[in-house]
Amino acid sequence: MKFPKILFRSAPSSVLYLPEIDGLRSLAILAVVLFHSSGYFYVKNLERGMYTATESAGDELIRWVLSHGFLGVQLFFAISGFVLALPFARRARAGESPPDYRSYILRRVTRIEPPYVIALCFYAAASLFLAPESFRPIQYMAGLCYARNAFFDDGTWLFYVSWSLEIEIQFYLIAPLLSLIFRLTSPILRRGTLAVAIVAAGFYAATYRLSGVEPMPLGGPLQHGWWLGPELAFFLIGMLVADIASTVHSKSSDKLVSFCWDVAWVAGLLLVLSSYRMLEHSAAGITALLVGLFLVMLGTLRSKWVRGALARPIPSMVGGACYTIYLFHPLPLAFCGKLLLPLTGNRYGWDMLLVAIPMGIAVTVSLLLLFPLVERPFMNRHWPQELVLAIRERALGRVIRLIRGQDQAIANRPTASR
């Protein structure tokens, strides 16, 4: 169908585009959205005195799966580590100089900042309209500098998902420095160093974060912070996978090897889904989470069936729009949840299956409509020049082509950032 392709087509800004990675992003964003969707009904019904009866085995299974949805953020961190490190790793293996830091930062700013600022303005307007008494402009000013969570800690912040974006920015700034590890010529030394760093960062994460204070599925032992340290291990996993991917061909002609990676991917997913409950008892949960994410990341690149499924148009389309979905999903979930709350409260499992999960999926799909407007234009690395030309020439067609994700002639012109 031509219409959906035109509407949702992404505009990859890199020749290293891997559709299966976007497919993996789709799993991460669905996990996060469903976690927030189920969490809304869980908290509201606890406040109403519901969910007091003994749960069935089915209820427990659904709760077990949904309670791990917040780990989609850690999967995003691992994906970011992989995507940002891969160009550095490939250039190092080819004997080329690393990407220019100025161009690297400029690209992060022009790609990531505009949708974030749009979302920040959206939540500021929503706060003024919905809860003007709790609106604090200073919080949004801090959010504009990716520093809100470092200075404020209260429940009036509508843009609560911004905490992970602030941590992502911290990693973006130091990723080129960390990527100097790829200049080491010995694979054993490179990967050994990364492995030791992952273990050390994981140990720090375990000691820092094993302090659950909220009821499941909203909190528990794995609490997030405001700075990169507790999350660094997940980014480093992505860097380790990038190093392996830069030296080992991702596709294997051996069917048995590919099948083994399919199995490894499933095993990794099960480890991730088991890690949360394990965290209640010991730091073994952090280990399970780290190993699970490593198997999921590498299995996505090396498997056959899983890789093929993730690279399909629908998963890669949803994953390509995950930034838009992540930025804007909290408020639609709260609005729809308020409307649907009277339909819930009898049984946790049925509430999740019949209301929370369908609502989360519906919000995810509906937010795809925002993607061409708030994100896709900025995936073209030359959008600032295109916008200037559109204003000078009064050419609305240039803006429309940016929204449609079509490359412009300027993409072939030399620029200062290239």
Regions found by a protein language model. Give the residues of each.
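Hydrophobic, membrane-facing alpha-helical anchors
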Residues: 25, 119-122, 145, 211-214, ...
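Membrane-cytosol interface segments of multi-pass membrane proteins
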Residues: 1-209, 321-322, 339, 343-418
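Signature aromatic-anchored transmembrane alpha helix within multi-pass, membrane-resident enzymes
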Residues: 194-199, 255-271
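Conserved protein kinase catalytic core
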Residues: 42, 249, 335
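Alpha-helical transmembrane segments of multi-pass integral membrane proteins
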Residues: 231, 235, 239-240, 262-376
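Membrane-interface helix-boundary motifs at transmembrane edges
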Residues: 94, 98, 181-189, 245-257, ...
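Interfacial loop-to-helix transition and helix-capping segments at the boundaries
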Residues: 16-19, 61-73, 155-167, 207-237, ...
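Generic structural signal for alpha-helix termini and adjacent loop/cap motifs
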Residues: 36, 91, 244-247, 303
